[in-house]
A protein has these predicted regions:
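Flexible glycine/proline-enriched surface loops and loop-helix/loop-strand junctions
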Residues: 107, 124, 128, 197-204
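Beta-strand segments within the central parallel beta-sheet cores of soluble alpha/beta enzyme folds
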Residues: 6-15, 41-46, 71-75, 136-143, ...
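Conserved active-site "lid/cap" helical segment
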Residues: 1-22, 26-34, 41, 125-134, ...
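Flexible glycine-/small-residue-enriched beta->alpha junction loops
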Residues: 70-126
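Residue-level signature of catalytic and energy-coupling elements of molecular machines
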Residues: 9, 52, 72, 123, ...
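Conserved catalytic cysteine-centered active-site region
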Residues: 16-71, 113-119, 183-209
Length: 221
């Protein structure tokens, strides 16, 4: 899409928070699958909520420092493929109950310092601290959805999107547009129950969804 030869890219920096089960070095995999040679650098960044943006910042720093002339930066995430983890199974479970942990929760959606506390509760606390009302959050979400739908329908980002082919039991499916905006029913948004607090304002509709996606930027001096 950027009309850049793969061999001209000096370094690849990709954000990924849920890498379990993806195989080693997701950034290197992305680079190789894009035809970028092994002589180029490849680094995977794990930073909560902002790994893709942090990847772009690191690529920018490398360009300014002169360690790269052309860099590829972005993020890759597949929340639907996040596996379940079996702690202590490697050494063998003993008497008593074992536990299955959700990689998406334990390494992504739960706070590491307050076990069991979901990150969405911090969004709730932030909304309360800054007095963001439920109506304001819902209106923001609705406006975002409408913009996303319009952009998909009129092809605003068509030149920046690459079709993805998914193999299923019934055959191959080609995904050519962002599916998520069309899964939401805008009319139901104002009536949804709070997700993290009984009297809260954050809902499944006005917060981030469980989804898969990837994006990349070609950056140069």
């Amino acid at each position: 899409k950027a009309n850049i030869k793969p061999e001209d890219i000096d370094d690849v920096v990709m954000g990924c928070v849920l890498p379990a089960g993806m195989g080693q070095a997701p950034a290197r995999q992305a680079a190789i699958n894009a035809g970028i040679p092994n002589t180029s650098g490849a680094t995977t960044i794990n930073k909560m909520c902002g790994s893709g943006m942090r990847a772009a910042m690191i690529a920018n720093d490398q360009l300014l420092a002169g360690s790269s002339l052309i860099s590829l930066a972005g993020g890759i995430e597949s929340m639907s493929n996040a596996p379940y983890i079996l702690p202590k199974v490697r050494d063998g479970l003993r008497m008593g109950h074992g536990q299955v942990q959700d990689h998406m929760f334990i390494d992504g959606l739960e706070d590491a310092y307050e076990p069991g506390r979901l990150m969405g509760s911090y969004a709730e606390a932030t909304a309360e601290a800054y007095q963001f009302t439920r109506e304001e959050q819902d209106n923001f979400a609705i406006r975002s959805l409408k913009r996303a739908k319009k952009a998909n329908e009129d092809g605003s980002f068509e030149d920046e999107m690459v079709p993805v082919t998914i193999k299923t039991r019934k055959g191959s499916i080609e995904v050519t547009s962002d599916e998520q905006p069309f899964n939401a029913d805008i009319n139901k948004i104002p009536n949804l129950k709070p997700a993290f607090s009984k009297d809260g304002t954050v809902t499944a509709a006005n917060s981030s969804s469980i989804s898969d996606g990837a994006a990349a930027l070609v950056m140069m001096t």
